[in-house]
Amino acid sequence: PEFDTGIKEWLNANPDKLTNNGGNDMVAAVTAIGYDAYMTALEALKLAGSTDRAAVLAAMPNVSFEGVTGPITFNEIGDANRDGAFIKTANTVDGVWDFVKVQTVG
């Protein structure tokens, strides 16, 4: 919720940003996930202290931070330690995506 509010404030503060977002302040379903992916790469680059591909890959299991979608950590082989999925359904009446809930597995 805080992420959505922050993005909407950022979009509405500048007419050009709002126009580039399709003329509205809707937040796409994958925005938060994309943000966390970007921040994950940034954290791996910082830990690696290099842009060398092998060094960044080797740093991935050590990435650990609080993302907007929850804690971001990886196991020793580089798989994300996640047990949830963000599920939305297509609302064909209104033409929007409806958030169902965060689904957990395990």
Pin down the residues of each PLM region:
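Extracytosolic ligand-binding ectodomains
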Residues: 1-106
